[in-house]
Curated annotation (Swiss-Prot):
One of its GO terms (biological process) is cellular response to misfolded protein. GO terms for cellular component: aster; endoplasmic reticulum; endoplasmic reticulum lumen; perinuclear region of cytoplasm; plasma membrane; spindle; spindle pole. This is Torsin-like protein. It comes from Caenorhabditis elegans. Its main location: endoplasmic reticulum. SUPFAM superfamilies: P-loop containing nucleoside triphosphate hydrolases. Glycans are attached at residues 125, 250. It comes from the Eukaryota. Disruption phenotype: Worms show defects in asymmetric divisions in early embryos. In particular, mutations specifically affect the reestablishment of asymmetric PAR protein domains in the P1 cell at the 2-cell stage.
Length: 356
């Protein structure tokens, strides 16, 4: 309502103040010209004011930056060379394609703490000024958004409307489906038309949108392949996407739950199955260092004893070598905070008594 009053005031100013109009547009010749220019100035100011108060689907609110996306994934994500290669290049290609045939659909797979949510956040941050807080980013968590299995028909309608409404506002919208392996097959099937090779659906073009599916499914297969590479003495960086993608596709198609028998796979609508490898101790060490710097305690990064205490507080597998972190970097923040609390000087009893 306040916006309506502001717009009305702007129109009044543009219409009656020919001096203002002349400054903006040039010399006024007659009353007809005055009205035309007033209307044009009004709508121009209206659009500017709207985008000042609300998020709009153009710069500066939408401003994909390939270079910072590449740099962020390279500098903030550890031990995931395949992610950098596939994700950065696929998004770059999709963004700069003036006539994509379908939305970009990425399926992230791997154990917890390997960086799936983190990469989705990095993508959002390098596409929208507000990142995950953007109205054009929909972060959908299966167990939170669709908890009742008896309401699947209601959820289908709700999900379709949510997707359609978001893309109506911005064709560059991003949809992140967390815990996609826990989504009922009916709900994944409900979004199939939006991912398919259609120019429009209900008058809306979805081909410039991005859909990201996050799943723990396939984590065991990814860990097996990575473990075999490690035990053979070869660097993990030599692993290629081809070693995982077919396994993940078959696993996702046949495994009970999640993407089982989904038309998304049988119709080849998922563009890339992206494996997130289990993290080794050296990668977790990098996560500890990054968190310490974030907390303003970069001085502790070189404190070997401190960092080792954090690393030793985590669990590793397999039992024979303990080469890989069971929780990736997911528990690093909590464990690092705990160790920092142990070395933080306590308030003396004198200070405590003074405060009382």
């Amino acid at each position: 309502m306040k916006l309506d009053y502001v717009l009305l005031l702007l129109f009044h100013l543009c219409f009656v103040n020919t001096e203002l109009i002349s400054v903006i547009t040039g010399k006024i010749k007659d009353s007809g010209t005055t009205i035309a220019i007033s209307a044009g100035a009004f709508w121009g100011l209206k659009d500017r004011l709207k985008c000042y108060l609300y998020e709009c689907c153009h710069e500066p609110d939408v401003n994909f930056n390939y270079h910072t996306l590449d740099a962020d994934i390279a500098n903030l994500l550890f031990g995931q060379h395949l992610v950098k290669d596939v994700v950065v290049n696929s998004i770059k290609s999709h963004w700069y394609n003036e006539n994509p045939r379908k939305p970009l659909v990425l399926s992230f797979h791997g154990y917890t703490g390997s960086g799936k949510n983190y990469v989705a956040e990095i993508i959002a941050n390098n596409t929208f000024r507000l990142g995950l807080r953007s109205t054009f980013v929909q972060h959908i968590v299966a167990t939170n958004d669709f908890p009742d299995k008896n309401k699947l028909e209601e959820y289908q309608v709700e999900l379709r409307n949510r997707i359609l409404t978001t893309v109506q506002k911005c064709q560059r919208s991003i949809f992140i489906f967390d815990e996609a392996d826990k989504l009922p097959e009916q709900l994944l099937g409900a979004i199939k038309p939006f991912l398919d090779y259609y120019s429009t659906i209900s008058g809306v073009d979805f081909r410039r949108s991005i859909f990201i599916l996050l799943s723990n499914k396939g984590g065991g297969e990814i860990a097996r392949i990575t473990k075999e590479q490690y035990e053979s003495g070869y660097p993990r960086e030599q692993l290629r996407l081809e070693a995982f993608e077919r396994e993940l596709m078959n696993f996702s198609y046949n495994e009970k739950g999640g993407l089982q028998m989904s038309e998304l796979i049988s119709n080849h609508l998922i563009d890339h199955f992206v494996p997130f490898l289990p993290l080794q101790r050296e990668h977790v060490r990098s996560c500890v260092g990054a968190y310490l710097r974030k907390r303003g305690r970069g001085d502790l990064v070189s404190n070997v004893d401190f960092v080792e205490r954090v690393l030793n507080s985590l669990q590793y597998f397999p039992e024979s070598s303990k080469a890989f972190s069971s929780s990736g970097c997911k528990r690093v923040d909590a464990k690092t905070d705990l160790e920092m609390a142990k070395i933080r000087p306590l308030l003396s009893s004198v200070h405590f008594d003074d405060e009382l």
